[in-house]
Amino acid sequence: MSDNVKINVNGVQIESEPNKLLIEACEDSGIHIPRFCWHKRLDPVGMCRMCLVEIETPRGKMLVPSCTTEVSDEMIVDTESDIVQKAQEGVLEFLLINHPLDCPICDKAGECPLQDQTMAYGPGESRFIEEKRHFEKPIPISEIILLDRERCILCARCTRFSDEISGDPLIEFIQRGNKTEVNTFPNEPFKSYFSGNTVQICPVGALTSTSYRFKARPWDLKSTRSTCNGCSMGCSIELNSSQNKMLRILGVDNDHTNQGWLCDRGRYNFEYLNSEQRIKSPIKKTESDYEDISLQDVYSDLNKIIEDKSSKVTFLLGSNLTNEDFSSFNEFSNKLGNHEHSIYLNEDIFYKGFFDEETDNAKIDDLNDSDTIVIWAEDLKETLPVLYLRVRQAVKNGVKLVVFGHANSTLTDIADVYYSEDIVSNNFEILKDISDLKEINEHVKGKNITAILGKSSPNQSDQSLEKLYMYLKENTKMKLFNAFNGGNSFGAFQMLDNVKGNKEFAAEISKETTDLLFVVGADPIGKSIFSSKIKNIIEEIPTVVSLDLFLHETSELADYIVPTSSTLGEKEGTFTNIEFRTSRIDKLVPSPGQTLSDWEFILGLSNFCKFEEMFESLTDLNNKSFKDFEIDTAPTFDNLDKPRNLDGIINLSLPNILTSEENIKFSNSLFVSKKLYGDKVTERHSKSISLLGSSQFIEGNESTFEKYKLNSGKCILVQENIEITVNYKINPSFPDGLIFIPKNRRNMNKLDFSKEIEIMPSLFKEALNVK
C-alpha cells in the first residue's frame, strides 16, 4: 500500500496503484465515470469523450479523458462539475442526432449503455429536428452477425477487438468525416472465430447475432453462471433463458481463464437444446425399427447380463461429461468386482502426457509472466481458441513466442521463431539437435518458459515430443500445459482410476473381450480416425447401450438408447480445465421428456443390480468425488459457491493414462486434426453454426497441389470404393508434400488414414460424391 498514490476525487481521497488509468482507479473505489469506447480488456483510445473529467493543473482546471489519463500523486479530480456535466450532455446530444428511435425493437434495449447514460447524464430534450441519417438495415456481415449502421456510435470497440485481441482485422472504419461507418471489406465477410465477442461488447445494438435477434428482453431472462465444456479451457459463461428455452450465452470476465472472451462455437453451440430431434424417452432396437421401452425394463435387461459373473463390461465415455458423471462410472466399474472392465475416453490424440512432480503445471496467468512461450501442439486457434487469445495477449505484452510446426500456422504472424520443414519433418519429428538451434539458445535457454505441448497429429510419435520436453526441463525454468483439448479431459484424468483412448479401444476391444458396452456422450464412428475399426467392433458386441442426446452414427448401432441431459444448462456438476482449475456447471433449463443425467442413470442401474449404495444424491457424489482433496480447497459445491471461489479452485493430481507404445502410422504424408467447426451432432442441430463446419477441404502448399495437377479449386480423395470431392486450400506455411485433412468434417471419417489415399483432379464442381 505504501507504493500507492493518493488522489482526490470529488472531495474524497482515494488510493490507487501508480500508472493506473483514472477511469479504473475511480471504478475500483466505487465512483462510476460514464464511457462508451473504453473497455478494460482493450487499449484505451479516448474516442467517445464521454469519460471527460476535470483535473487541476498548474495552468488551471482542464477537461481530460479519464480513459487515457494515468493517476498521479496528489491529483485533484472532479467528475461531477458543471463543466463535466455540460460536456457529457453535449457528447450524448451529438450521438443522438442520427441515432434511430429503435429502442422498442432493439435487442440491446434494457441493457444498453447509451440508454442508461442518456437517462443519467444526457440532456432532457433534443434540439435536432432535421431528418436522421439512414442506411440499409440490417446487413449480414457474416453467417451469424448482423450490422445496423444507423445505431453505430463509432466507439471502435469491435474494430479494436478484432485487431488487438483476435488478430482478425476484418471489420474496420470506412469513409471519413460525418460519413464514417463501420463495415467489412468488399467480398470479405466477418469470418472470425471470435465475432460474437463484438456483439457482447458493442455498447449499442449496432451488432446483433442471428441466434438472439428479437428473441427476448433482458428483464424476461433467467440467468446463471456456468462453465463452457466445448474444450478444456473451461471458459466462464453466463447462461440466459426465457420460458424454459436457452436463448443466449455470454462470456463472464474470469481474470484467470477467458477474461470475458468466448469462441463462437462456445457462444452459439446451444440451440440443439431446443431441437425437436432430441431423444426424449428410452428406446430399444428391434429387427426393423425402434420401440419405446421403460427405464426399468432397460435396467432389468442389463442386470441379466451383469448378473452373469463371466460377463465383461466396457465403457467408452465422451469428454463432455461432468466430473460427477466420470466419478459415478468409475465407481460403478469398480463395483463390478471380478468382471473384466475397462474405461476408454473418446479421444484420438491420447498419450501419457508429461505429468510428474518435478514439472510445474502451468496456470493460464503464467503466460503473461513468462519470458518465452514454447508451443508444439494441435492448432490452438482450432482446438483451444481462447487459450490462443491469451497467447496473443502475452505476445502483445512483450513475451517471446517460439512455435514448432506445422499445426500452428495461425501464429506465424506473431511468432518470434517458427520452426518449419528445416527443423520439423512432415511426420512431426525434430530433424536437428535442439541444443544446436541458435534461436532456442537465445529465447529459451535459462529463461522462464511456459510450454504448451501436445501431439499435433495422431501420427506424431511420443518420442518427438519427449525430446523437446526433456530439453526444456533440463535447460529452462519451465511451467507446462499438457495440451489435451477434449472438453472435460482433465476431469476424466482426476476422476478415473485409469483411462485409455480410441487407439487402445480399437486395438483391445472385440466380442471376445466385451459382452456389454456403454457408449456415453460419444460418437467415435462419426468423428474418430479409427471410425471403421470401431464400427466393426461395435457391430459385433452382443449388447450396446448408448446414453446420448441424439441419434447419430454410433448411437444408431446401439441396442438400447437412453436419453440424457446436456452438460450445458441441463444439469449440475463440476468441470476441470487445462490448468486443473475446477469450476461449477449449473442448471438453468429443464431437460425434455424422460431425459436424465448420466450419473442418475448409473445410480439407478447400480441400485437395480442391488450393489452397495454408491451415493445418495448429487451433492453426496460431488463430496465423494473429491474426498481425497484438502477440505478447504476441494472443489465441492459448498466451497465453489463461496464468493472467493467463483472463478474456480486449482487442485493438481497425476493422472493414470494407459496408452500403447505403438505409434500410429499414416500412409501418405498426412496431417490429421480437427477444425473448430465440424459435423458434430450438436453443431448440426444448432442452426446458427450448423453450416459453418459443413464444407469438406484439404490444405497444402501450392507446389504440393501442383504435383497432383490440381487447378480447379476442387479435387477428389479416392480410397478403394470411396470418392469424396473436396475443395483444396493453399497454406504457404506448410512444407512440400504435407497435406492437412480435418477429421471432423462430414464423410472424412470414411477414410482409413493408414491406407493410401489418392488425390485426383476434379472435373466437376460437385459438393460431395461418396460412392
Positions of predicted regions on the chain:
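A generic structural motif
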Residues: 338-351, 401-408, 476-489, 541-551
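A glycine-rich, hydrophobic/aromatic-adjacent loop/helix-cap motif
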Residues: 450-510
